[in-house]
């Protein structure tokens, strides 16, 4: 019998730059069990805002995205707003930050961390 394995496509894009920066931050903390949680909450000037936090625990209903040895966690409520989005890390003259490019956002704020859907 031949087993067929089907790889499930990732619900969002976690770029190499973002994964590299997350790994660097985890290494600085000296806690290899840390994972980066990205979430959406109410607030900001456009209705919703993005947030990032490090956690060790994966919740039962979390979606995980693994890249280059690091794990991104997304809760179900946030996932509905982040499907198809790209999580990136940019280092520029304006500063260094994680950036979310979200095709579901109908408007975004100038700060880049607030949006409406």
UniProtKB/Swiss-Prot annotation:
Gene3D superfamilies: HesB-like domain. The keyword Signal does not apply. Its cofactor is iron-sulfur cluster. Keywords: Iron, Iron-sulfur, Metal-binding. One of its GO terms (molecular function) is 2 iron, 2 sulfur cluster binding. GO terms for biological process: iron-sulfur cluster assembly. PROSITE patterns: HESB (PS01152). Pfam families: Fe-S_biosyn. It comes from the Bacteria. Iron-sulfur cluster binds at residues 45, 109, 111. Binds 1 iron-sulfur cluster per subunit. Required for insertion of 4Fe-4S clusters. Homodimer. HAMAP family: Fe_S_insert_ErpA. Belongs to the HesB/IscA family. This is Putative iron-sulfur cluster insertion protein ErpA.
């Amino acid at each position: 019998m031949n087993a067929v394995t089907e790889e499930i496509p990732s619900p969002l894009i976690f770029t190499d730059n973002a994964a590299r920066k997350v790994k660097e931050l985890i290494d600085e903390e000296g806690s290899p069990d840390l994972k980066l949680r990205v979430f959406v909450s109410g607030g900001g000037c456009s209705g919703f805002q993005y947030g990032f936090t490090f956690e060790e625990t994966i919740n039962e209903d979390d979606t995980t995205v693994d890249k280059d040895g690091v794990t991104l966690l997304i809760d179900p409520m946030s996932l509905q707003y982040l499907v198809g989005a790209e999580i990136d890390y940019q280092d520029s003259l304006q500063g260094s930050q994680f950036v979310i490019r979200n095709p579901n956002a109908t408007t975004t704020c100038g700060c880049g961390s607030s949006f409406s859907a």
